[in-house]
Amino acid sequence: MGGRYCEDCAYQVINEKNHYIKGIGNKQSNKIIVFPHLGFSDKTIINSEAFKQISELYDTLFDRNILDDYYITCFVKCPISIKHPIDVMTKARCYNYLREEITNNKYNILILLGNACSLINVRPHSTNNVYRNCTGHYVFVNYSPFVIRYDLLKDSYISKFTSIFKAIAYNNLKEFIIKDL
């Protein structure tokens, strides 16, 4: 499955050998989107409902495939089940993979979706801010993943992501308050 970090992980046993979730998209991009995890029935990012919705929005805004401009990955590298919560050791193992993906991509923009920020231990003050880490990289945080209560909050999701994608595309972060992490 995943390799050296997955040894003795409960999710490796649950998911057998063939369900390791790999990132997709442009590995040379300096922009990364991190989903917290996929549901147990999702085997790949591209088939997940959350990816389909964010991809459709991006295509509508820019008439481009999001995979041409972004690298997209998950924090937890196995599809997870509600019956088996993510424990501290699982977070630590998966964080090692994410750290390698982020380091190898030399990102400048990182968009954390859902609870990915808490899994990575980023503690933002507000989702209306953009955070700059100590190396000058920008981190966008969105507590509202597309997969939860999307039907009730669709307009606010679309508005939030439209402003994020446009700010990044046009290199204009003026509408966001930039704070240091």
Please tell me what each predicted stretch does:
Residues 1-181:
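A polyanion-binding, active-site-adjacent surface
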